[in-house]
């Protein structure tokens, strides 16, 4: 059995873990000769989940100021404030620039690597940690953590290869449950619980929500589901799902009703995919939808195809279009359903029309405005951790000091990143949470270590 001693051990080589390593090494190296900061990553290389972020482009932060940024953080944005001000979005861009990665900013204050390659973000994070003196060890699957208050080195971390790493401080940054193929399998929740921490209810967020009839859900597939309302993304599309899949709606309104009450509404882009309703506003609404479904509530999505037009004005416009079609000699001998299709081509994307007709069989030129302003879809489920962007819930932030991210229950233990009961909307918020909390945890662990050794 191989024993290795370190000053600080960081479990997890994702966004939070790499930033914790950089912050810890930078801080400790200024006060101590030959500090040893070790990152233990179970995957063959670090930053696996970052690599798939933003379809490989990696929207790594958002440049909104704190007042606007905090509106996109759940459930208690105030907890993030000390971490954010220690490492703001602007500072993160400078941080990456200092190790050779330039950025660009696109619509919605979203920042991307100038190369549009997520791998550049990972490479920059690894460089920053290693330049500061941290060691990143891959293929190191942690199987046990022991906290021994009487020992000089308070933490003993055992890996599957029988190697044991001991340290004064331990930072756990193992991520959540989303995209388990990248290594996020929820290990950190168990370790946190073993050390006395409570875990707030976990559920998928920033995921596809599935309308009734969108997928061929069978009793057998329901039995295989891991949680109430979970519909595996691999479940085949139904006839309706196939008609809708691939449609991308621009500048529409989306309202979510929970048990008949309006819960939220958004304006923007909505996509029908092989998973269900996605896109920026679909993802943003998913948090409330999933939570409601898990708790047994009825969820309904209402799409406003013409949010910029009042229904009265839309009715006038449609009546005018209908009269023009009726007067057109080319329509004189056409059946009503064919003239109605012509009308639909003037108010809907062509690709969407077959699905719209099938799902709204009673719509006609008189009721079309009402249907366009309120296309209702009852929601039966959601895509789970296999393809959700982030895990909501996590280690209770009530048990963690926000100014240091140290455990209130176990001295010398720190948490950062998705493992915390802290998550954001789509748009770069979740990676910034990971960067800011990871960096502060690393700095705090080093500062505490320095103060204890003076």
Regions found by a protein language model. Name each.
Residues 169-217, 234:
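Glycine-rich loop(s) and the adjacent beta-strand/alpha-helix scaffold that form part
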Residues 9-11, 40, 142, 164-181, ...:
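Short hydrophobic core segments
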Residues 138-153:
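A conserved short coil-to-beta-strand element within the FAD-binding core of flavoproteins
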Residues 45, 66-68, 76, 85, ...:
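Residue-level recognition of phosphate/Mg2+-coordinating polar/acidic sites
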Residues 9, 25-55:
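Glycine-rich FAD pyrophosphate-binding loop
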Residues 42-135, 140:
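Conserved N-terminal/central alpha/beta ligand/cofactor-binding core
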Residues 2-16:
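Beta1/beta-strand and adjacent pyrophosphate-binding region of the FAD-binding site
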Residues 178-191, 195, 422-450:
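A conserved FAD-binding loop/helix module that cradles the flavin
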């Amino acid at each position: 059995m191989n024993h290795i001693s370190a000053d600080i051990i960081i479990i997890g080589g994702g966004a939070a873990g790499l930033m914790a390593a950089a912050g810890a090494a930078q801080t400790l190296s200024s006060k101590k000769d030959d500090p040893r900061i070790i990152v233990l990553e179970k995957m063959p290389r670090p930053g696996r989940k970052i690599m798939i972020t933003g379809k490989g482009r990696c929207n790594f932060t958002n440049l909104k100021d704190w007042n606007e940024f905090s509106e996109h953080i759940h459930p208690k944005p105030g907890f993030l404030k000390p971490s954010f001000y220690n490492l703001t979005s602007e500072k993160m861009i400078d941080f990456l620039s200092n190790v050779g990665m330039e950025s660009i900013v696109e619509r919605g204050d979203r920042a991307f690597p100038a190369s549009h390659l997520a791998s550049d973000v990972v490479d920059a994070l690894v460089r920053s940690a290693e330049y500061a003196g941290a060691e990143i060890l891959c293929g190191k699957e942690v199987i046990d953590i022991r906290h021994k208050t009487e020992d000089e080195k308070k933490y003993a971390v055992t890996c599957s290869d029988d190697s044991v790493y001991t340290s004064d401080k331990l930072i756990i940054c193992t991520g959540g449950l989303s995209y388990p193929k990248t290594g996020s399998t929820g290990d950190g929740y168990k370790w946190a619980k073993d050390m006395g921490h409570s875990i707030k209810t976990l559920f998928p967020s920033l995921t596809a929500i599935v309308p009734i009839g969108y997928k061929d859900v069978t009793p057998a597939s329901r039995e295989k589901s891991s949680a109430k309302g979970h519909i595996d993304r691999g479940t085949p599309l139904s006839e309706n799902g196939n008609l809708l899949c691939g449609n991308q709606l621009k500048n529409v309104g989306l309202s979510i009703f929970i048990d008949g009450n309006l819960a939220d509404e958004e304006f923007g882009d909505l996509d029908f995919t092989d998973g269900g309703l996605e896109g920026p506003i679909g993802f943003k609404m998913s948090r409330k939808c999933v939570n409601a479904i898990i708790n047994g509530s009825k969820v309904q999505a209402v799409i406003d195809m013409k949010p910029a037009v009042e229904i009265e004005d839309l009715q006038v416009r449609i009546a005018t279009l209908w009269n023009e079609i009726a007067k057109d000699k080319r329509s004189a001998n056409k059946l009503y359903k064919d003239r109605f299709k012509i009308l639909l081509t003037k108010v809907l994307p062509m690709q969407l029309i077959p699905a719209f007709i099938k799902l709204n069989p009673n719509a006609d030129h008189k009721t079309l405005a009402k249907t366009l302003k309120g296309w209702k879809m009852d929601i039966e489920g959601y895509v789970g951790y296999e393809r959700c962007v982030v895990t909501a819930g996590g280690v209770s932030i009530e048990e963690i000091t926000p100014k240091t991210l140290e455990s209130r229950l176990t001295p010398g233990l720190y948490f950062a990143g998705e493992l915390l009961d802290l998550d954001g909307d789509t748009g770069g918020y979740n990676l910034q949470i990971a960067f800011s909390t990871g960096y502060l945890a690393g700095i705090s662990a080093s500062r505490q270590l320095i103060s204890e050794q003076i």
